[in-house]
């Protein structure tokens, strides 16, 4: 399979996002923290959620989740992501960002500090986790941001892994990829060449099992 030709060592640190530059070498990607903000297009059904999120002080807050205590808090159907309560169940890991549904997650600056040199054969990402027993399609999302001079944004949406690669999720900026375990505690994710269009990208890690914040690895693909 595709993982067998790769001989690169596992990254040194947990939650390191790396891009393979050959079968045996990689570069570490920069990590950035996003801010939750109101979606910049028309709201429609998300207006109520946005209002509730604003009232709870989510808007403009860092995306993060408390590991103190395992209380699950739901206010107006939103999961609490602030310091008051964390979502304690591993099974709920993918719901960390549920409170951000329909909101934009924005990153300062119009461009990542890292540009992929050659994306013509697709992009291979190597990510070290706590362990690699989860399906990477459930715990990672790769997005193509809407980029302006001032920031990069993605409207957050929740969907099952089976929808990765569907027309609807791709239209919203969610990139199709495949994932496999690699080594003792890493994952190898592959973005096919057909998806590796010029633009600004981010890799979201959605599990909250040990995370107190959600680091997002970013990269650019030039024309």
Q: How should these model regions be labeled?
A:
Residues 4-168, 205-223:
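Primarily secretory-pathway and cell-envelope proteins
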Residues 113, 189-190:
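Short, solvent-exposed loop/turn positions at domain surfaces
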Residues 117-119, 181-183, 195-197:
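Solvent-exposed loop and beta-edge segments used for protein-protein assembly and interaction
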Residues 122, 184-188:
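A generic structural signal for beta-strand entry/edge sites
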Residues 158-184:
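Extended, solvent-exposed segments with strong compositional bias
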Residues 185, 192-204:
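A glycine-anchored, Pro-Gly-centered beta-turn/N-cap motif
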């Amino acid at each position: 399979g595709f993982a067998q030709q790769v001989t690169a060592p596992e990254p040194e640190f947990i939650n390191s996002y790396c891009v393979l530059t050959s079968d045996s070498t990689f570069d570490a990607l920069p990590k950035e923290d996003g801010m939750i903000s109101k979606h910049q297009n028309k709201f429609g059904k998300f207006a109520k959620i946005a209002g509730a999120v604003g009232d709870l002080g989510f808007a403009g807050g860092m995306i993060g989740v408390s590991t103190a205590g395992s209380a699950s808090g739901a206010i107006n159907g939103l999961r609490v992501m602030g310091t008051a309560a964390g979502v304690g169940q591993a099974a709920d890991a993918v719901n960390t960002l549920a409170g951000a549904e329909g909101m934009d997650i924005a990153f300062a600056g119009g461009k990542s500090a890292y540009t992929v040199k050659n994306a013509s054969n697709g992009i291979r990402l190597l990510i070290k986790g706590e362990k690699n027993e989860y399906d990477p399609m459930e715990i990672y999302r790769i997005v193509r941001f809407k980029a302006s001079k001032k920031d990069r944004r993605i409207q957050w949406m929740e969907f099952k892994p089976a929808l990765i690669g569907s027309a609807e999720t791709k239209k919203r900026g969610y990139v199709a990829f495949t994932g496999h375990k690699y080594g003792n505690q890493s994952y190898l994710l592959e973005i096919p060449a057909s998806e590796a269009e010029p633009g600004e990208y981010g890799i979201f890690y959605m599990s909250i099992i040990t995370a107190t914040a959600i680091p997002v690895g970013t990269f650019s693909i030039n024309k």
